[in-house]
From Swiss-Prot:
PANTHER family, per database record: UVRABC SYSTEM PROTEIN C, UVRC/OXIDOREDUCTASE
Gene name of this polypeptide: uvrC
GO molecular function: DNA binding; excinuclease ABC activity
Name the UniProt record assigns to this protein: UvrABC system protein C
Domain of life of the organism encoding this protein: Bacteria
Pfam families membership: GIY-YIG, HHH_5, UVR, UvrC_RNaseH, UvrC_RNaseH_dom
Subcellular location: Cytoplasm
Main location class: cytoplasm
Species, as recorded: Shewanella sp. (strain MR-7)
Keyword terms, alphabetized: Cytoplasm, DNA damage, DNA excision, DNA repair, Excision nuclease, SOS response
GO-annotated cellular components: cytoplasm; excinuclease repair complex
CDD domains: GIY-YIG_UvrC_Cho (cd10434)
Length: 609
């Protein structure tokens, strides 16, 4: 492929200084960002006669022009390169697609502080513990905290509305400060102990509780002493389950395994010498990328992520050494304005943690490769059965979900040769049709999917329709209209359930000929079709349920004059749900913040009809 780029002419203008270069394709998209200590030397290497790397050959064949930015130092170049990669997400760079902010446990600054799950900017006044590797780890920790420390986890609106203890008090998971079941001093003491525990100082917590238990026993307050005893026993059980290292402090331990184009970075988050959590990352790696670039790109993007800068430890231990390690240390230290070191040759506890991280990374890659190979085999068998001339690169499946015609949602899921490609999934809220008309819903969904399709768009090789011949005919009609001027169109296949609707009894129908066929119930090709069909059904029904719930809550309350989103939210939170709002008296409605007695009467009358 020729793009008209004159490399020799361009190289004559390039400086030998440090800097960053951006490579563009003919459409003006940035396809690669790189940095160099000597730009002229680095860029010249792309245009040698013998390029051994397939990735580099493919990259060079698409270059239309190159922009260069000079920097004061190699460290500055490294930081600017990272900024450009985040900005442009070039297809030939290693990309860490991890745009979620990290979750925390939040302890509020309130007369009676609450513990809560938090994700997002740290704006509210209080104490933030974390970040945790994922939301599940936070929820698990909060559940544990309820058993150890009777501190409220309800929101402030619910707290203010209580006139008697809730179920959490009956379960001994909250001391009910909302209704005065505990003194402020006792509650504050539990908050202090919980805070120490979240900081990893469980030995100090146990020591303080032992002292309180002995004091209570001396004063013959045996019931209180028994509560402290139970709390101590629970804390000791938790402490015994945690792996502890005596002198490691705070650090991240990273095991790396890279094989067959799949890279896994398994991180152990060590805080106060304990495994605080773990998480695997799978950066997008272009084919033929060397391990040096994979390591450097991941570490730079991960540790300069704005969401985690507040809690980056000073020390990182990683399983692989690489050439630019010290330059990367300097760049991250400069960006964060704090000491940052990367170690690869470690002993004792650090070596033990590193072996654990590396084992997890290796197992993760092997599992992915096994899954990838299984999916690949299923694709090959499906291609043979369908007698296709070219490999299947993309499959899509549509499904419709509604309840008696209410809140109809269509789903489109996408599979490539590695399995589900969830970034490409789409949902369509269906509007303007007769409720329950699945044919009209399918027509609208397919029309919207291919409304602006052209030869450069993402055209599926196979398009599955979860339904019978009627829906398939509608879909085929729309596809014929949309692709009339294009050389390629998807092959439509309907997936009709058998009379008993049992898996394995599906009938498959070609959209163009309407001829049908079936596969053996143990056929791997059928399993692939069932997988994409089931995934489409799951994605559709989840979207439908979410839309239905939102519609029911919103339309019922917001149709009442004077009730907007804020008052609707206050009513639902304060009273616990729509049914509770419907069953509430005027007096109960008037207790909700922002609801006057007149407004309460209006709501009561509207909901009671």
């Amino acid at each position: 492929m020729s793009t008209g780029f004159n490399a020799q002419s361009f190289l004559r203008t390039v400086s030998s200084s440090a800097g960053v270069y951006r490579m563009y394709d003919v459409k003006g998209d940035v396809i690669y960002v790189g940095k160099a200590k000597d730009l002229k030397k680095r860029l010249s290497s792309y245009f040698r006669k013998n390029l051994g790397n397939v990735k580099t050959q493919a990259l060079v064949s698409h270059i239309h022009h190159i922009d260069v930015t000079l920097t004061h130092s190699e460290t500055d170049a490294l930081l600017l390169e990272n900024d450009y990669i985040k900005q442009y997400m070039p297809k030939y760079n290693v990309l860490l697609r991890d745009d979620k902010s990290y979750p925390y446990i939040f302890l509020s600054q309130h007369e009676h502080p609450r513990l809560a799950y938090h994700r997002g900017p740290l704006r509210e006044k209080g104490y933030y513990f974390g970040p945790y590797p994922n939301g599940g780890a936070v929820r698990e920790s909060l559940h544990l905290m309820q058993k150890l420390f009777p501190i409220r986890q309800c929101d402030d609106l619910y707290y203010k509305s209580r006139t008697r203890p809730c179920l959490q008090y009956q379960l001994s998971r909250c001391s009910a400060p909302c209704v005065g079941k505990v003194s402020n001093a006792e509650y504050d003491e539990q908050v202090k102990l919980a805070s120490l525990f979240l900081k990893g100082k469980d030995k100090q917590v146990i020591s303080e509780l032992v002292a309180k238990m002995e004091e209570a026993a001396e004063q013959q307050a045996y019931e209180q002493a028994a509560r402290f005893r139970d709390q101590i026993m629970a804390l000791r059980r938790v402490a015994e389950q945690q792996e502890v290292s005596g002198n490691t402090g705070d650090m991240d331990v990273i095991g790396v395994h890279y094989a067959s184009g799949i890279a896994c970075f398994h991180l152990l988050f060590i805080r106060e010498g304990k495994i605080f959590g773990s998480r695997s990352y799978y950066p997008t790696v272009p084919a033929q990328t060397d391990i040096e670039e994979v390591l450097r790109s991941f570490l730079l993007q991960f540790y300069l992520n704005a969401d985690i800068q507040r809690t980056i430890p000073k020390e990182v231990v990683i399983s692989h050494h690489f050439e630019e390690l010290h330059e990367l240390e300097a760049a991250v230290s400069e960006a964060l304005n704090k000491k940052f070191s990367i170690k690869t040759n470690v002993r004792a506890d650090r070596a033990s943690f590193l072996r654990l991280a590396l084992t997890n990374a290796t197992n993760a890659v092997m599992t992915r490769l096994s899954h990838k190979n299984t999916v690949e085999q299923r694709f090959v068998l499906l291609e043979e059965i369908l007698e296709l001339n070219a490999p299947i690169q993309r499959m899509e499946c549509f499904d419709i979900s509604h309840t008696m015609g209410e809140s109809t949602v269509a789903s489109c899921v996408v599979f490539n040769r590695e399995g589900p490609h969830k970034a490409e999934y789409r949902r369509y809220n269906i509007e303007g049709i007769t409720p329950g008309d699945d044919y009209a819903a399918m027509k609208q969904a397919i029309s919207r999917r291919f409304d602006k399709i052209d030869a450069s768009g993402k055209i599926p090789d196979i398009l599955f329709i979860d339904g019978g011949l009627g829906q398939l005919r509608i879909a085929q009609q729309i596809v014929d209209e949309k692709f009339v001027n294009l050389d390629k169109a998807p092959q439509l296949i309907g997936v009709a359930k058998g009379e008993s609707r049992k898996p394995g009894l599906e009938t498959l129908i070609f959209g163009d000929t309407e001829s049908s066929f079936s596969l053996e119930d143990d056929s791997p090709a059928l399993h692939l079709i069932q997988h994409i069909r089931d995934e489409s059904h799951r994605f559709a029904i989840t979207g439908h349920r979410n839309r239905r719930q939102k519609t029911r809550n919103t339309s019922t309350l917001e149709s009442i004059p004077g009730i907007g989103p804020k008052r609707r939210k206050a009513l639902l939170q304060h009273l616990g749900g729509l049914q509770e709002v419907k069953g509430a008296s005027v007096a109960e409605l008037a207790k909700v913040p922002g609801i006057s007695i007149e407004m309460a009467q209006t709501i009561h009358d509207a909901l009671r009809g």
